[in-house]
């Protein structure tokens, strides 16, 4: 039995069949994008349908970029979200204010680039339930790129393959260019609380591929099992 279970968020779902498949293969969370320029954007009416299909034990995450409190409340009038993800330039005070008004936990995304002070960022957003680390690109979103994992503070990483992450680490959600081919290495190196994937499970931008979704979830579970076996060996 692995000592660590990596949670899995499949983001940017737009079709009912995608949500049904995510639930069937054991995803812990799905992500719905409420940022109109994104190819994965979903209108409120469609999002409400998708969220209801997720059922009671899958976290439904709403991704917002520089949205106002009124924007978020308008979505929540129809969409039963259970987690907010702020993916723009929102300051900590605004994130906490919006989440407090609607009574939901929240994540804050950081687009990682050389020179970024992740420890200072984590301190500023200490009231978030987790930090999502994504690749930096112009605009918003990671664009399917992997960022340099050596930029993650060493005190946040496991001290050896057989040990969990240290208590100094925030709840990290690792994103940015993940796929079934590289997620095992990410888990072994970073040991994140969760992994988040979007483009890595697509056949084309905004079009999810069920075989890739299945392969990604399988790769995460196998990586967790391998880490558990190495601890017990």
Curated annotation (Swiss-Prot):
- Specify whether Amino-acid biosynthesis is a keyword of the entry: yes
Query: What reactions does this protein catalyze?
Result: N-(5-phospho-beta-D-ribosyl)anthranilate = 1-(2-carboxyphenylamino)-1-deoxy-D-ribulose 5-phosphate
- Which pathway features in its UniProt record? Amino-acid biosynthesis; L-tryptophan biosynthesis; L-tryptophan from chorismate: step 3/5
Tell me which domain of life the UniProt entry assigns to the organism this sequence originates from: Bacteria
A molecular-function term among this protein's GO annotations: phosphoribosylanthranilate isomerase activity
**HAMAP family with a match to the protein in the record:** PRAI
Which CDD domains does the entry mention?
A: PRAI
- Protein name (database record): N-(5'-phosphoribosyl)anthranilate isomerase
- EC number(s): the record gives 5.3.1.24
Q: Which organism is it from?
A: Ralstonia pickettii (strain 12J)
Which top-level enzyme class is recorded in the Swiss-Prot or TrEMBL entry?
Answer: isomerase
The protein's UniProt keywords, in alphabetical order, are: Amino-acid biosynthesis, Aromatic amino acid biosynthesis, Isomerase, Tryptophan biosynthesis
Q: Does the keyword Transferase apply?
A: no
